[in-house]
Swiss-Prot record:
Organism this protein belongs to: Lactococcus lactis subsp. lactis (Streptococcus lactis)
Family to which the UniProt record says this protein belongs: Belongs to the AlaDH/PNT family. CEOS subfamily.
Designated name of the protein: N(5)-(carboxyethyl)ornithine synthase
Temperature dependence: Stable to heating at 50 degrees Celsius for 10 minutes. Rapidly inactivated by heating at 60 degrees Celsius.
Taxonomic classification: Bacteria, Bacillati, Bacillota, Bacilli, Lactobacillales
Role of this protein: Catalyzes the NADPH-dependent reductive condensation between pyruvic acid and the side chain amino group of L-ornithine to form N(5)-(L-1-carboxyethyl)-L-ornithine. To a lesser extent, can also use L-lysine as substrate (yielding N(6)-(L-1-carboxyethyl)-L-lysine). NADH cannot replace NADPH in the condensation reaction.
Gene transcribed to yield this protein: ceo
Transmembrane residue ranges: none
pH and activity: Optimum pH is 8.0. Active over a broad pH range of 6.5-9.0.
Activity regulation annotation text: Is potently inhibited by the reaction product N(5)-(L-1-carboxyethyl)-L-ornithine.
């Protein structure tokens, strides 16, 4: 199968998900956009030496049966997408990718292979199929999201925590673990809350100086911090949403970017950057390339089409 890799044009994105050193025994033909590895100083020739075809962005879209885009494909590229094409990457169908699914995936009958760490699935014509991709495959990327996001938020806010700084972390998954690993180097005054202990957090949330969210709630779930609860927070409270569940877990919050990571509202400060692993792209690219090579690129990606064949007749 012909798989095209395009440079992510998502704001601030620098990760390179496939490195030449990991290209070996691929069952797919790889088409790479010119300058794909520039953030890691990788020349096009290094990809060409591994058997990849180097093309312009438009040519990659036109000639590929599947497009791999690490982050959500942006509206500027919508016109490139053609009916029945496969899209592989983090598409967040129920989150930031809802408009993409509605405006592109459904009308163009795209086969969307979403690489969600907890539940990688295939989305096609309003149906969801098992992808066969192992769950938790990209857990290190989630860990780095929490780790790097917390560091960046603290520096952008202008504060290194001390033992006097009261810190709450919501969640127990990979993102929350990364957040704890990062912030615990500066303070031990940290309380972690899980879904089962959220009632205790609700009793104490106004005491905290920093609240770090590592939970992504369901589309029909109530927010963990409602509008009214946010009003009760101390002036200057920093809310770091490293799960980047904008508008959901923290009601009314909105995405920020690496270039403008924090906004203030009613004396509270919000950090909701959706691609924090890109802050440490040199580390993350190494991890991603190895895992994606073994589990996505090396195996014939036409296997994903087989999964949706009952509807694709």
């Amino acid at each position: 199968m012909k798989i095209g890799l395009v440079k992510a044009n998502f704001p601030g994105e620098r990760r390179v998900p496939l490195l030449p050193k990991d290209i070996k025994d691929f069952k797919n033909e790889i088409l790479v956009e010119e300058g794909f590895g520039k953030f890691l100083d990788i020349d096009d020739q290094e990809y060409s030496d591994k058997g990849c075809h180097i093309l312009s962005r438009a040519e990659v879209f036109a000639e590929s049966e599947a497009i791999f885009s690490l982050k959500l494909i942006q509206p500027t590229d919508y016109y490139h997408l053609r009916e029945g094409q496969m899209i592989i990457g983090w598409t967040h169908p129920f989150g930031s990718g809802q408009s993409f699914m509605k405006e592109q995936a459904l009308p163009k009958k795209l086969i969307v292979v979403d690489l969600d760490s907890n539940s990688p699935c295939i989305y096609y014509e309003n149906e969801i199929f098992e992808s066969g991709i192992p769950k938790g495959l990209l857990y290190k990327n989630s860990f780095y999201a929490g780790y790097a996001g917390v560091l960046d938020a603290l520096l952008q806010y202008g504060l290194i925590p001390t033992e006097e700084t009261k810190i709450a972390i919501l969640g127990s998954g990979n993102v929350a673990q990364g957040a704890f690993s990062s912030i615990s180097k500066y303070s031990s005054n940290i309380r972690m809350y899980y879904r089962k202990t959220m009632s205790i957090f609700k009793e104490n949330y106004t005491k905290y100086d920093i609240i770090i969210n590592g939970i992504e709630i369901g589309k029909d779930d109530d927010p963990i911090l409602s509008f009214s609860e946010q009003k009760s927070l101390k002036k200057g409270t920093l809310i770091i949403d490293v799960a980047a569940d904008a508008g959901n877990t923290i009601e009314g919050s909105h995405f920020t970017s690496i270039d403008a990571p924090i906004y203030e509202n009613a004396g509270k400060y919000y950090y909701v950057v959706p691609n924090t692993p890109s802050l440490i792209y040199r580390n993350v690219s190494q991890e991603l390339s190895k895992i994606l090579s073994e589990n996505i690129f090396r195996k014939d990606c036409s296997r994903f089409i087989e999964k949706v064949k009952p509807l694709n007749k």
